[in-house]
Amino acid sequence: MMRSHYCGQLNESLEGQEITLCGWVHRRRDHGGVIFLDIRDREGMAQVVFDPDRADSFAAADRVRSEYVVKVVGKVRARPAGAVNANMASGAIEVLGYELEVLNESETPPFPLNEYSDVGEETRLRYRFIDLRRPEMAEKLRLRSRITTSIRRYLDDSGFLDVETPILTRATPEGARDYLVPSRTHPGSFFALPQSPQLFKQLLMVAGFDRYYQIAKCFRDEDLRADRQPEFTQIDIETSFLNEEDIIGLTEKMVRQLFKEVLDLEFGDFPHMTFEEAMRRYGSDKPDLRNPLELVDVADQLTGVEFKVFSGPANDPKGRVAALRVPGAASMARSQIDDYTKFVSIYGAKGLAYIKVNERAKGPEGLQSPIVKFIPEDNLNVILDRVGAVDGDIVFFGADKFKIVSEALGALRIKIGNDLKLHTCEWAPMWVVDFPMFEENDDGSFTALHHPFTAPKCTPEELEANPATALSRAYDMVLNGTELGGGSIRIHRKEMQQAVFRLLGIAEDEQQEKFGFLLDALKYGAPPHGGLAFGLDRLVMLMAGAQSIREVIAFPKTQSAADVMTQAPGVVDAKALRELHIRLREQPKAE
């Protein structure tokens, strides 16, 4: 081996020992004839000192520059009094260098590794192999490795089998666009990259494997956001002969153990909340419980007011009027209220009414608002009592269709909580349960809220009679307002699966064409089964305190789904296209 130790392994116990290090020159300093090199490797940093009385090694140290790859032989010694660096794990010791060998030189990097904050993300991604040398970036990938190791160990110990499922499969409707791969041997036909291993893991349950897991690559051709990538990694889990409570308990224990092992954090039991309660109280099916603000329904107090903005939705069975109290924010400037009004318009809200509570004891005169005059005093007092308003508070109102009000005020709740730093704790895990089976579209058709293979809490006959009110056996784990994982008990009877397909408008011939293999499998003794999939990238992002999943993926794509380092996607030559039986209608433009 070329090295005896990693830099991060050096400590006082090695004092007096000769060691060999290999790594990169992170920093070089010349102090009065003595040269200091900070050597960096995967495990950390070590300071190496070269004295002029060792002429060869001193001359070599004088020639090296940042990011040279070097091998150093020297003796560990305690640092002089006053020279201890508390910011380095090895800051109490240093290495007196005897030999220095340059293994490779380096050009000046495109950006300094010590001053990276002003470097644009595209530049960092173009030179990702340089960006990943920064200790904070390397630590994120080390954390990712520790997380996957902990999860694998837990699942292995719990009797799960790690089974790989195909990457080249067929397109199935799962909610997003597929990445398609043309087949050379089957002209005109295409494989699809999997959006998830959903159907294959269900087939493994039919095959009797009982407990399956996989750290699986998944692909979705969709618009990108801070927490989305065209290719992402899923912790995929499926098990037979367990109900939803069993699966929730098993995976919750896994996450609790993970946080204890990796971050030394102890979680208690995760609270459970129904989808309906989450939407009513927080305006979201993934509420951030660190934020104490809540939505409160007040429509019953506004059905008879002349102000149509309120009375219209208050009398509409599909409408909602809700209030959001912000404690101590009555001094909020009008410009800030205008900014929040513009913000909720993103979610379809037509405005944002408010009441500033200055002195409640004075009645309406103690309230500052353009809407107070439209609400009878008795109703106004009921509303203020219901939301818990006291002097110094501001109360915002939303009135529209239920979905618009919930999403707009739910997003406003999160924004105000962040703006005013209202979080009451650092971590808030929870479960959301009892999701609707379907979302009803404007034309009366239905879309599966999770996916078409989720089992309902009713019989096929009851489901087809009342699809709009049917609940599913689905469950989501939420952490700090981010969906960590979603799962469900699956349909394991053919009759139920066909009933769901019919409600989704999938005709029988299309069922056979796209899902015939699944329907066949359900005829041959499919066991009751269910599972859950966690987004590994999101989980690592949260545990690392990163702002984007791009920070915790070694080689991520940009917001436009491109790899600026390898220049992918790229143009394919004409011969390759002919072999795939593909002709381009328009030639790609040179960039």
From Swiss-Prot:
InterPro entries: Aa-tRNA-synt_II, aa-tRNA-synth_II, aa-tRNA-synth_II/BPL/LPL, Asp-tRNA-ligase_1, Asp-tRNA-ligase_1_N, Asp/Asn-tRNA-synth_IIb, AspRS_core, GAD-like_sf. The record marks 31, 82 as: Important for tRNA non-discrimination. Its main location: cytoplasm. It catalyses: tRNA(Asx) + L-aspartate + ATP = L-aspartyl-tRNA(Asx) + AMP + diphosphate. PANTHER family: ASPARTATE--TRNA LIGASE, MITOCHONDRIAL (PTHR22594:SF5), ASPARTYL/LYSYL-TRNA SYNTHETASE (PTHR22594). GO terms for biological process: aspartyl-tRNA aminoacylation. It comes from the Bacteria. This is Aspartate--tRNA(Asp/Asn) ligase. It comes from Pseudomonas savastanoi pv. phaseolicola (strain 1448A / Race 6) (Pseudomonas syringae pv. phaseolicola (strain 1448A / Race 6)). The gene is aspS. Transmembrane segments: none annotated. Keywords: Aminoacyl-tRNA synthetase, ATP-binding, Cytoplasm, Ligase, Nucleotide-binding, Protein biosynthesis. Residues 198-201 are annotated as: Aspartate. The keyword Cytoplasm applies. It is found in: Cytoplasm.
